[in-house]
Amino acid sequence: TAAQPAVAARLEQAVAAWRVDVFGADIAAKAVEPRTSKKGKTRGAFVVPDDRPYPVGYREFPWTPLPARDGVPHGGVRRSSSAPNSSYFVNWRTTDDRITWDVEVATSGTYEVVIDYTCPVPDAGSEIELSFRDAKLAGKVAPGWDPPLNTNQDTLKRPEGESQMKEFRPLNLGTVRLEKGRGELTLRALQVPGKSVMDVRRVNLTLKN
């Protein structure tokens, strides 16, 4: 930029115009610079704030996956890596911890709830609750399932920020009636008999009727 300021200015204007064209003027004005690592390398593209909820329950698409990458960890819960894509939630240990998704239910009805999970066998048995507005569904994390990480799938060394994956199994929590509207879908623990609750890859909501 110092060597060719005119070229740099022209490119900056082109990027600004592209943001307005793609995101609209209001959102483009809020775009922020990418975060940098301690080594000064850029990590990701420009960050554009977006408070749109994740849609749930269209009759044409009754199954809605809510992966960890779209959720928000609270308390001691952490992502399995700094890169959200293909990550899962770990370090869920107490009743003060929780995981949330900002969703908007399109169709009032009965939804089946299935969680893709792993849990050390000695820690199985935590009582958990999924809630959305006034609706609540409780269940138990069982049986235990603690597979090893898949460490033999990379031909090249995996970048530090990417998760090593493992085989998650479905935990059928049951069914719950969700009413149309926007709200916070919350997953929390009511009792934790062991050292941890579970690791969570995804919550699946399927509109049944």
Where are these regions (language model features)?
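Extracytoplasmic
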Residues: 8-209
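C-terminal, low-complexity/hydrophilic appendages and adjacent surface loops
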Residues: 1-2, 9
